[in-house]
């Protein structure tokens, strides 16, 4: 994308989170079914992780998936499901065994949000927006072929996906970093506070922009390097958590300068 000067794809749970997980853990059938549509932007995914009683302690989730012939029968609820009301499919953590330690009885399922028995309620935020939702499942039938990886071993997949999610969030801190971008920091500074020759006379502002750009570029290259290392390692890396923190702070700096 960068080599042909194409704009980055829109924020996508499919591209940034689920796609890499399917490449690593999915069956060939699952890859053929979902990856082309993800790449073409034809399908929107949401994430079924957090529950009313399982947020920070994600492994305490209680949404139940019971085997019934060739499918699972799903019952439970998720919360803070981003854009569930606009999504086509969901990747969801469910409990398939209640008689083992909580980290060992979790499975990773994919299913259509148009399935019978799903109810979505947007959560009204103080800002007036409603990108987060409550999602309820009542006897939702999910084909067993939609199980990613091995039954009861979904916690490993869940952690891997969270690693990709943290890298995605971290990368937001360096977005809009291209000089060619119409709304890049440099172009906005030239337009709003630039002189007739479009040069920015404010030395302090120029210094802030330069320092941000240096950190952003270094961070972007570091993310690339670690992403390459992730492909050859089966263990989740703690660096993704560090990157999420640094990327969030970097994004705050960007917003403060733009204001």
Locate each region found by the language model.
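Alpha-helical transition-metal enzyme core signature, strongest for iron centers
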Residues: 11, 38, 178, 182, ...
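A short, Trp-centered hydrophobic/proline-enriched beta-strand micro-motif
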Residues: 41-49, 93
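Short Gly/Pro-enriched turn/cap motifs at secondary-structure boundaries
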Residues: 53-56, 80-83, 98-100, 124-131
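A structural signal for short hydrophobic beta-strand segments in well-ordered beta-sheet cores
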Residues: 63-66
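A short core secondary-structure module
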Residues: 71, 75-121
């Amino acid at each position: 994308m960068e080599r042909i000067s194409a704009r980055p794809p829109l924020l996508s749970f499919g591209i940034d989170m689920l796609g890499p997980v399917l490449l690593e853990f999915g069956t060939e059938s699952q890859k053929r079914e979902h990856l082309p549509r993800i790449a073409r932007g034809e399908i929107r995914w949401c994430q079924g992780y957090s529950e009313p009683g399982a947020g920070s302690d994600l492994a305490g989730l209680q949404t139940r998936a019971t085997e019934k012939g060739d499918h699972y029968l799903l019952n439970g609820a998720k919360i803070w499901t981003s854009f569930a009301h606009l999504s086509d499919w969901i990747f969801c953590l469910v409990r398939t065994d209640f008689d083992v330690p909580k980290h060992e009885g979790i499975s990773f399922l994919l299913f259509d949000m148009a399935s019978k028995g799903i109810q979505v309620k947007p959560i009204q935020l103080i800002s007036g927006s409603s990108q987060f939702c409550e999602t309820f499942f009542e006897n939702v039938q999910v084909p067993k072929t939609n199980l990613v990886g091995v039954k009861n071993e979904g916690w490993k997949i869940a952690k891997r996906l969270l690693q990709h999610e943290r890298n995605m969030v971290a990368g937001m801190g360096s977005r809009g970093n291209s000089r060619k971008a119409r709304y890049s920091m440099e172009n906005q500074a030239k337009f709003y506070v630039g002189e007739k020759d479009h040069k920015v006379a404010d030395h302090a502002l120029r210094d802030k922009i330069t320092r941000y750009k240096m950190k952003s570029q270094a961070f972007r290259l570091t993310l690339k390097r670690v992403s390459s290392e992730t492909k050859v390692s089966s263990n989740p890396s703690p660096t993704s958590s560090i990157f999420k923190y640094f990327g969030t702070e970097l994004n705050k700096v960007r917003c403060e300068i733009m204001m």
